[in-house]
Amino acid sequence: MVEKLVSIIMPAYNCVDYISESIKSVQNQSYRNWELIVADDNSTDGTVDAVRSMAADDNRIHLLETDINLGPAAARNRAINAARGDYIAFLDSDDIWYPDKLSRQISFMEQMGYDFTYTAYEKINERGEHMGVVISAPKSVNYSSMLYQGDPIGNLTVVYNAEKLGKFYVPDIKKRNDFALWLKIMHDCDRAYGLDEVLASYRVRAGSISSTRKSK
């Protein structure tokens, strides 16, 4: 079976200490048909140079640059706008995917006919050490359960079917813009489905881009 293209959305800002490891976790995927779109938000450290170096050796990596810092929502939206994939996935520049993350999740979606999915994940510290904390993936959530019971979805685990649902852009709000995005998607697909396998590592550190999971 021909693998459909997955567009991976990665905003980046002053993350030179972590972004190479994050990108390598994408390059190590057993699922090979992907494009990684790194939207830099006017970094002032060596982030851009690190991405340029890796992109020079792998034409699946694309760097979007800007001379204005506009925040993570705008960065994600620039990457989403450039995405060509049948599926859209999200990974922040300090987080890590397990090697079979995409293959397991895309297979899950195609076998079950699901258009919006997420997985379980673990927490690691700034040094990449396991913290012994796993965030499980509920079987499914819908708009109402998200509003009244909270958001169990880790940004780094989400994949949605852009070929079927179209593209969704991140609301430009200061807090929980990922949560607002999931609600937008659920207006069209009603429900998101969880694959309760740990397939990613969320790095807990000061200054992390993602607004999800900091309180858990």
Model-identified regions with their sequence ranges:
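Acidic helix N-cap motif at the loop->helix transition within catalytic regions
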Residues: D17-S20, D45-M54, I96, D100
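Glycine-rich, basic loop-to-helix element that forms the pyrophosphate-binding segment
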Residues: T66-A83, R104
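N-proximal low-complexity "stem/linker" segments adjacent to membrane-targeting elements
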Residues: M1-Q27
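Conserved nucleotide-sugar donor-binding catalytic segment
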Residues: N81, V133, A137-K216
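Short aromatic/hydrophobic "clamp" motif used to bind/position activated sugar donors
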Residues: I88
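Conserved donor NDP-sugar-binding/catalytic core segment of glycosyltransferases
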Residues: D100-M131
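Short loop->beta transition adjacent to catalytic acidic/histidine clusters or analogous donor-positioning motifs
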Residues: E3-V6, Q27-V38, G46, N59-H62
